[in-house]
Amino acid sequence: MKNILKLSIAEMHDNLKKREFSAVELTKLHIEAVNNEKLNAFITKTPEIALSAAEKADYIFTHQKENLTPLTGIPVGIKDLFCTKHVRTTACSNILKNFTPQYDSTVTKRLLDNGAVMLGKLNMDEFAMGSSNSNSCFGHVKNPWVRADGVEVVPGGSSGGSSAAVAGFLCAGALGSDTGGSVRQPAALCGIVGLKPTYGRCSRFGMIAFASSLDQAGVLTRTVEDASLMLQSICGYDIQDSTSANIAVPKFSESITHTIKGKRIGIPKEYELSGKYQEYTEVSEMWAKGIQYLKDEGAEIIEISLPHTSYALPVYYIICSAEASSNLARYDGIRYGARISSDDINEMYELTRGHNFGTEVKRRILIGAYVLSSGYYDAYYNKAQRIRHLVINDFVESFKKIDYILTPTTPKEAFAINEQLDTLTMYLNDVFTVPASLAGLPAISVPIGLSKSNLPLSLQVIGNYYDEGGILNVASIIEKHTGKILK
């Protein structure tokens, strides 16, 4: 048998059913890997909780087989944005460094109720704001992939700990969150699968808020099939979340038919950047390869236009910053968060928020406060919301004549950890993922190959609302042609 840690979730499940190894043995191997990791992916480790869950899983495998699920006994990691009962949850911010919730987030509870084994909490950009996982009070995360010249690179963000842990074989799958690309972009840079479901498909209860109209839980796995299994366990209506969609959840794995003959694939001309920027040529070549794969399988390729794409990124950063400034107002050291004491209440607020929030979080709070201020609300926030509707309408009109959209996930490969990028260049990492987030559409990132620097490149499949099964199927075709790039 190949290295047990490198098995997919589906393969682990099959071997557990055959009793080739026990859930406890599987968990102990993962605990050892987590304890010896050099990626800084796990910030809180829960070996006792994991072993207890594994023992329960083994009992189910031997005595209660009727209660088995595809995730029973499977070791997973949880992004530190999701509340975990009696386990520290910090959003990787100093202001929450000692916060221990008294309840689980809905998606965490559903994952654990399905028998998954929690190995611990995963590193991330502070409050999910970032695309490199360098904005964490616990330090940056390393990508398991190293550039051909030996340079270490970022894992992407904000779910960088999740993507690095899965790609580094520290856990079989991980929970992440996606606001503007925070599941898909790190998955792309680490060469794994990352899926953001339709907004409302998964509950946000117990998920520390960044931008409430955009935040959505997602999954990161090493295969498309595994993504369908993890997603199945966390979806569903939740009365505790007013934005949760009360809509039936299909069996996603049954949608993976490995056939797309006759399906119409839209190729948006606005996503082609190689003519403007030479460094994007390699990504465009991989995009063309993916298009050919789908064409060879009988799909119809149709060029489409999403005319307001160029506005998506600035609109996103106005809206998400506005919502962040509102959501993070509660962390004042009195109601929530660590406090730096002072005899003067205004000075206490200033010290508490000034010292406990990181640079990127403070930047977005300031931008958000500015665009929501009385003199600029109409000029910025209100206008951004109007343009958001135009972006949504572009997708609505396109899906009248196509079934899926295929794009690159990121404009280029992962950059070096020590590379100093200006803020605008950093924000451009999300240029291909943000439009689907603004529209609330489901989207999946799947590896397409390696760059000349031996780093992963990926493609994104966007589907219509609640068609997670469909995008999983299209992604499976690309996966079939590409094969696993993780060794």
Swiss-Prot record:
Its EC number is 6.3.5.7. GO terms for cellular component: glutamyl-tRNA(Gln) amidotransferase complex. GO terms for biological process: translation. It is an enzyme of class 6 (ligase). Keywords: ATP-binding, Ligase, Nucleotide-binding, Protein biosynthesis. InterPro entries: Amidase, Amidase_CS, Amidase_dom, AS_sf, GatA. GO terms for molecular function: ATP binding; glutaminyl-tRNA synthase (glutamine-hydrolyzing) activity. The active site is at residues 79, 158, 182. It holds the Pfam family Amidase. It comes from the Bacteria. It catalyses: L-glutamyl-tRNA(Gln) + L-glutamine + ATP + H2O = L-glutaminyl-tRNA(Gln) + L-glutamate + ADP + phosphate + H(+). Belongs to the amidase family. GatA subfamily. Allows the formation of correctly charged Gln-tRNA(Gln) through the transamidation of misacylated Glu-tRNA(Gln) in organisms which lack glutaminyl-tRNA synthetase. The reaction takes place in the presence of glutamine and ATP through an activated gamma-phospho-Glu-tRNA(Gln). HAMAP family: GatA. Heterotrimer of A, B and C subunits. NCBIfam families: gatA. This is Glutamyl-tRNA(Gln) amidotransferase subunit A. It comes from Ehrlichia chaffeensis (strain ATCC CRL-10679 / Arkansas). The lineage of its organism: Bacteria, Pseudomonadati, Pseudomonadota, Alphaproteobacteria, Rickettsiales.
